[in-house]
Structure formats: C-alpha cells, structure tokens
C-alpha cells in the first residue's frame, strides 16, 4: 500500500509508480490511493475528505501500474467520521451520517471495469461499544461511523477490500475498561487482555459473516 493521495495528482503518480516498479520486481502487489480521506492514518493528517474524481482513475491506473485502487466516496478515518452538523438525527436523537457516494463508485466501475477497488476508513462505530466505553469511564462524544447496510452494498460491487480498524480499537478498549472497573485490584494483563481479545474476535467474526460476506472465501 502506498498512499500518495495527500500529494498533488502528478506527484501521487510519480511516488506510486516508484513503489510499483520496485515491488513488482519481487512479485508484490501494490495498492494505490486516489482521493483524500479525512482523519489521521500513519501520521498523515487530512482535515477534510476529497472525493475521488472518476475521470482520473483510468489515467492513474495506467501510469502507475497499481494492482488495486483505494478511493474516496465518503468514508474517513477514526471514530468521529463526521461532524454533527454533517449528520441528521433520527427520532431517538442518534446521529445519522450522510450516505456514501455510490454514484462515484459506479462511475469508477464503468471506467475501469473489473479492477479491484478498496475502501479505507469503513468502521461502523457500533453504538453499543461507544456506550460501553463511556459507561466505564470513557469520554467519546458524537462518535459516528459508516452504516453497515452501506458496507454490505459496497461489498457486492467491485470493492474487493474494506478496511475496518477503529471498530477493533473500540472493542478492545471497551473490554479492557469494563474488566478493570469490574476488577479494580487486577494487575495481570492476561486477565483484561483476554476479554479484549475475545470481544475483538467476535466483532470481526460478525463483520466477516454478516457485513462483508467474505466468510469461506479465504
């Protein structure tokens, strides 16, 4: 994976092509990125998202030689993917994020049919995990992610990989906080990391089977 999306377009092509040329010598595939996701990843900070421009994808793929392409259609990094003012609220006051730009994805599919597409920043930020963290001393406010029904739709398209990281962090943090509050005298990491591991495993099991539809496809 080489993310040059924070560079100007031509610089992104140049940097990505260098990685591709080196990696392909060793039969290593390379994922490039076009379009910017808001948030922080690997010390790269972006204040706001910039949607992928479909008219650039053919040129980018051809000139870089990447094997897959991460695009920006409304996902973003972290557990606070959208500001409250970007969302609506349901009858219970729960923040509802804006929908993903599937029109952009469909146009990209039309321009580079069959090419593997990737989505980063696709955690759904489960409300029950946020509540669990806050119940046991956390202070997470206005956390909101990508609805799972939208991820299911994406998984049925040309999207071959969907990155989900923050949900795993939430699961582990929630389990550790609960374990330490329930057992304040505990100091053996095995006693609180064990529950964290179990909840993490259950989370990704549900994602693989119920959201991504990728079970038995390894």
Where are the predicted features?
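Short catalytic/ligand-gating loop segments at beta-alpha or beta-beta junctions
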Residues: 119-124
């Amino acid at each position: 994976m080489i993310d040059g999306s924070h560079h100007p377009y031509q610089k992104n092509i140049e940097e990505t092509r260098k990685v591709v040329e080196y990696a392909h010598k060793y039969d290593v595939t390379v994922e490039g990125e076009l379009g910017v996701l808001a948030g922080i990843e690997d010390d790269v900070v972006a204040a706001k998202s910039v949607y992928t421009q479909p008219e650039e994808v053919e040129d980018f793929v051809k000139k870089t030689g990447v094997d897959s392409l991460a695009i920006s259609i409304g996902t973003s990094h972290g557990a606070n993917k959208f500001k409250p003012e970007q969302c609506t609220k349901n009858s219970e006051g729960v923040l509802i994020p804006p929908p993903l730009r599937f029109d952009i994805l469909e146009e990209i599919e039309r321009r580079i049919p069959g090419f593997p597409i990737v989505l980063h920043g696709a955690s759904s930020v489960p409300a029950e995990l946020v509540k669990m963290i806050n119940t046991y001393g956390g202070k997470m406010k206005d956390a909101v992610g990508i609805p799972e029904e939208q991820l299911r739709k994406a998984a049925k398209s040309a999207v071959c990989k969907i990155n989900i990281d923050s949900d795993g962090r939430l699961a582990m943090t929630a389990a550790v906080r609960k374990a330490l509050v329930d057992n304040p005298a505990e100091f053996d990491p095995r006693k609180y990391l064990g529950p964290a591991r179990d909840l993490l495993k259950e989370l990704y099991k549900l994602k693989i089977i119920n959201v991504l539809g990728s079970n038995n496809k390894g």
